[in-house]
């Protein structure tokens, strides 16, 4: 066997199986078949190459390899014998007969491979089943043991069909539960929906008096047709036609009159046109009038229809938010599942009725009033409790004057008589038992309850009231003189200026030497010496104070760091890079990649000869320390001979030629299995399981555990947790 043809066959098989194409390249496949015709040894080598590719964990490689098997299987008896000898392993790698060894990804290609393999095995059995016993056994194994349906277009296995049946049963069970729930809801809610429709229709009919049946489509159509018939006649002719029609009815009832009398009566009934025009003063029978009548009906909310409008608004909200979505869900479930016609008809009629009543509501164009909501706000410091509620506008029709016979009932004093005093007396203020604003009954009850809670010493309201009184003491009732007032005002003004100055002034930390500047420190360098360190037994001796000289020196001295003036770095590293450029880092002393920075020229060569000699010695030393087998040229030769990557292309550092360490893909045409799909789950995983995020979470959890252990370190109960 020629080694050149052997290598060429290996290269062709690798190129065909790693192309990633759904179909084989016929030109290269012809070369493979041409080499296999030479000798059986090439077929043996081809068989081993194919089985190696079928064991790869990539569905695209297996699909291309199986297509090559199908091409050679029908042309070589020797290849058929080799393949059928190891037919069980071949089925495991292509048909997925072993559940513990599923086909590798991508899933779509794996599904296509399994379908193609089952169809091909069926065609092989039909053609070569009688000649090859193991092929027939393999076919019956798939059909009877693995329950493969060869007539199925998708050629699904037993496990797939079971999964599909379970999924279908689960969907049927879910739909059945939804159907039962919809039927139960329909039985319970139908009466309520019909009552809501009746109430809303009645309210709309009361708001818009429909004397002309505007909401009835049949009546509206009949009215429009009669209007169109009469639109071509003048107004006076319409009256004449009505009068003429009435008299014609009278003529039909009178059947005993002769033809002459009927003609005379007809002549008498028809008025003279000229006489009619002269009597009415009209110039012509036909006149054209243009009237702009608004077709939109608009209902305004007033005091008279306020109750109706509120009811319509509540019912409209109930229909739009509750009833209509519920009925639509019923119709959707009934459509998917398929129910009896009567149930579907009832649901459809309910839906149409709800939509019709909503169209009526839109036709009315109701102008709702703005509703004011009474909101309680939190009282600020220094405010009275009476200001906790928002002011309510006066009600329409309210009269501030209260009659005399009702003043006692309202708790007001009687108005003095006008005979005793010449001036008009003002009504006295009402007697208020508790600080409750007369807003409404609910507000008064709320304020009364708050007052009761303040009187109860066990409530939090009483404690808050005491704290408010302490923070904001009541002003004294005595009237100060002018001098005290001026003193207080001057002190307040000085305090305000100090506060402003302290607010603007920066806060700088200082030591004890500045705190006791110009004074003698009382406890400078003195510490208390405890002779006994026992936990329970303490001696009777008095603890003595000892002066520490180091501490005294620290209290009297200060160390001030002089930072100096910042000088920016103007030089660059300029060390040669693997890609041919120069290092642009501007470190002050040392570059983290190229060591100490030395002066270099524009080409990156050292300016000083001493630096050049030192760099040459360091380079020679590194080469001597490196083993001989790490020589790049030797490694490249070994790689070319063995076909394995020994790392000759890898360089120390950031990579070369600007690739930043990214190696070239060996088979770029194949689908990258390591590349994750850009889904929401992958994006969330990338953010949540990021190293920095995990580190921050770990630090926070460690701090929490540390605080817990420090707090409960001496309690044996928490030591067990």
From Swiss-Prot:
Composition bias, Basic residues: 653-667
Ranges in a coiled coil: 155-203
Protein name, as recorded: UV-stimulated scaffold protein A
UniProt biased composition (Basic and acidic residues): 240-258
Region Disordered, annotated ranges: 223-272, 409-433, 472-498, 616-635, 641-721
Residues where Zn(2+) binds: 573, 583, 591, 594
Residue location of crosslink Glycyl lysine isopeptide (Lys-Gly) (interchain with G-Cter in ubiquitin): 395
Lineage of producing organism: Eukaryota, Metazoa, Chordata, Craniata, Vertebrata
Function recorded in the entry: Factor involved in transcription-coupled nucleotide excision repair (TC-NER), a mechanism that rapidly removes RNA polymerase II-blocking lesions from the transcribed strand of active genes. Acts as a key adapter that promotes recruitment of factors involved in TC-NER. Facilitates the ubiquitination of the elongating form of RNA polymerase II (RNA pol IIo) at DNA damage sites, thereby promoting RNA pol IIo backtracking and access by the TC-NER machinery to lesion sites.
Molecular function GO terms recorded: chromatin-protein adaptor activity; RNA polymerase II complex binding; RNA polymerase inhibitor activity
């Amino acid at each position: 066997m020629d080694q050149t043809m052997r290598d060429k066959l290996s290269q062709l098989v690798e190129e065909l199986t790693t192309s990633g194409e759904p179909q084989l390249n016929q030109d290269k496949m012809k070369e493979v078949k041409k080499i296999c015709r030479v000798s059986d040894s090439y077929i043996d080598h081809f068989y081993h190459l194919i089985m190696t590719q079928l064991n790869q964990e990539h569905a695209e490689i297996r699909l291309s390899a199986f297509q090559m098997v199908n091409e050679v299987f029908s042309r070589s008896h020797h290849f058929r014998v080799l393949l059928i000898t190891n037919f069980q392993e071949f089925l495991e790698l292509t048909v997925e007969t072993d559940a513990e060894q599923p086909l590798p990804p991508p899933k779509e290609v794996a599904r296509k491979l399994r379908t193609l393999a089952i169809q091909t095995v069926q065609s092989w059995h039909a053609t070569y089943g009688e000649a090859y016993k193991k092929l027939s056994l393999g076919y019956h194994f798939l059909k009877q043991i693995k329950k493969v349906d060869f007539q199925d277009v998708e050629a699904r296995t037993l496990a797939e069909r079971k999964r599909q049946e379970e999924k279908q049963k689960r969907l049927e069970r879910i739909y059945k539960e939804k159907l039962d729930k919809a039927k139960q809801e329909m039985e319970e809610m139908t009466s309520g929906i019909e009552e809501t429709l009746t109430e809303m229709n009645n309210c709309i009919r009361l708001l818009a008096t429909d004397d002309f049946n505007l909401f009835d489509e049949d009546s509206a159509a009949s009215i429009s047709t009669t209007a169109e018939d009469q639109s071509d006649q003048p107004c006076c002719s319409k009256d004449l036609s009505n009068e003429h029609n009435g008299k014609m009815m009278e003529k039909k009832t009178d059947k005993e009159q002769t033809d002459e009398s009927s003609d005379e009566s007809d002549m008498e009934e028809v008025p003279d046109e000229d006489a009619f025009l002269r009597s009415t003063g009209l110039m012509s029978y036909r006149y054209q009038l243009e009237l702009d009548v608004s077709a939109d009906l608009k209902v305004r909310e007033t005091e008279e229809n306020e109750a109706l409008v509120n009811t319509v608004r509540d019912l409209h909200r109930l229909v739009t938010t509750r009833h209509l979505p519920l009925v639509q869900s019923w119709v959707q479930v009934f459509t998917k599942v398929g129910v009896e016609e009567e149930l579907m008809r009832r649901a459809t009629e309910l839906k149409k009725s709800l939509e019709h009543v909503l169209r009526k509501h839109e036709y009315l164009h109701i102008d709702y009033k703005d509703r004011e909501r009474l909101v309680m706000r939190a009282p600020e410091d220094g405010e009275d409790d009476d200001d906790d509620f928002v002011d309510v506008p006066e009600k329409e029709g309210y009269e501030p004057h209260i009659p005399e016979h009702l003043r006692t009932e309202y708790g007001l004093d009687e108005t003095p008589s006008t005979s005793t005093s010449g001036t008009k007396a003002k009504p006295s203020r009402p007697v208020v038992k508790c600080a409750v604003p007369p807003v409404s009954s609910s507000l008064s009850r709320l304020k009364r309850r708050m007052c009761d809670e303040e009187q109860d010493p066990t409530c939090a309201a009483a404690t808050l009231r005491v704290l408010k009184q302490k923070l904001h003491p009541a002003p004294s009732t005595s009237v100060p003189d002018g001098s005290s007032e001026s003193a207080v005002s001057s002190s307040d003004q000085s305090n305000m200026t100090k506060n402003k100055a302290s607010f603007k002034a920066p806060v700088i930390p200082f030591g004890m030497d500045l705190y006791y500047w110009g004074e003698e420190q009382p406890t400078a360098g003195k510490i208390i010496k405890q002779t006994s360190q026992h936990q329970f037994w303490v001696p009777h001796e008095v603890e003595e104070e000892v002066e520490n000289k180091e501490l005294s020196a620290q209290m009297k001295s200060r160390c001030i760091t002089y930072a100096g003036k910042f000088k920016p770095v103007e030089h660059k590293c300029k060390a040669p890079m693997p890609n041919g450029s120069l290092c642009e880092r501007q470190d002050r002393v040392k570059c983290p990649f190229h060591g100490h920075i030395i002066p270099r020229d524009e080409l990156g060569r050292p300016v000083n000869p001493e630096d050049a000699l030192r760099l040459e010695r360091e380079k020679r030393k590194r080469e001597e320390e490196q083993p001989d087998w790490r020589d790049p040229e030797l490694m490249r030769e070994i790689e070319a001979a063995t076909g394995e990557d020994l790392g000759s292309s890898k360089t120390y550092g950031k990579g070369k030629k600007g690739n930043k360490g990214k190696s070239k893909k060996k088979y770029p045409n194949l689908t990258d299995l390591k590349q994750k799909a850009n889904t929401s789950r992958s994006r969330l995983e990338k953010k949540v399981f990021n190293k920095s995020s995990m580190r921050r979470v770990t630090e926070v959890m460690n701090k929490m555990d540390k605080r817990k252990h420090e707090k409960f370190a001496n309690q044996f109960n928490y030591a067990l947790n």
